[in-house]
Amino acid sequence: MDCKATVKLGAFSRDGKTRGDYKASDHDFGSTEHYVPCGLLEEDTAQLYVTFGSSAKTSDFIVDTLTAWWQGLSAKAQGAIDRVQLKMDNGPESSGVRTQFLQRMGHLVDTIGKPIQLRYYPPYHSKYNPIERCWGILE
């Protein structure tokens, strides 16, 4: 599971760069629309679940994404899972010492009735997280 930096939308989504001819706009007001992607990769089934939020990358957004993923599973799939294992980078919004994140995860464990195991990669090693290979589709 991982969240990425803000993704701009519209004419400025790639810093204004394009591979083809593009007619320039009359005025350059910049892009005000942006979204924050948060993704979850199920390694057993190779299914990618991506949510886009319009707010900041926070611990609440991460837990809300995980909750939406769980609710989207069928009852049979939920029953087949004995524990949820999350491989995460050690970012500030999902750190194991951040009380808001741990409190929300505790409530989620109580809600779903399954243990959640948080596995953190050391600093500067998030490239080994399998979800990192999926972010190229946003470019």
Regions found by a protein language model. Give the residues of each.
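Short, surface-exposed basic-aromatic patches at helix termini and helix-loop junctions that form
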Residues: 100-114
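Short, conserved catalytic/metal-binding motifs centered on acidic residues
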Residues: 1-2, 46, 89, 129
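Electropositive, glycine- and tryptophan-enriched low-complexity nucleic-acid-binding patches
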Residues: 23-87, 92
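Divalent cation-coordinating acidic motifs and surrounding scaffolds
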Residues: 11-15, 23
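Short secondary-structure boundary/capping segments
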Residues: 14-18, 100-103, 134-138
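Residue-level recognition of the N-termini of beta-strands and the immediately preceding loop/turn
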Residues: 80-84, 114-119
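RNase H-like two-metal-ion nuclease catalytic core shared by retroviral integrases
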Residues: 96, 119-139
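Active-site- or DNA-interface-adjacent structural scaffold in DNA-acting proteins
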Residues: 1-12
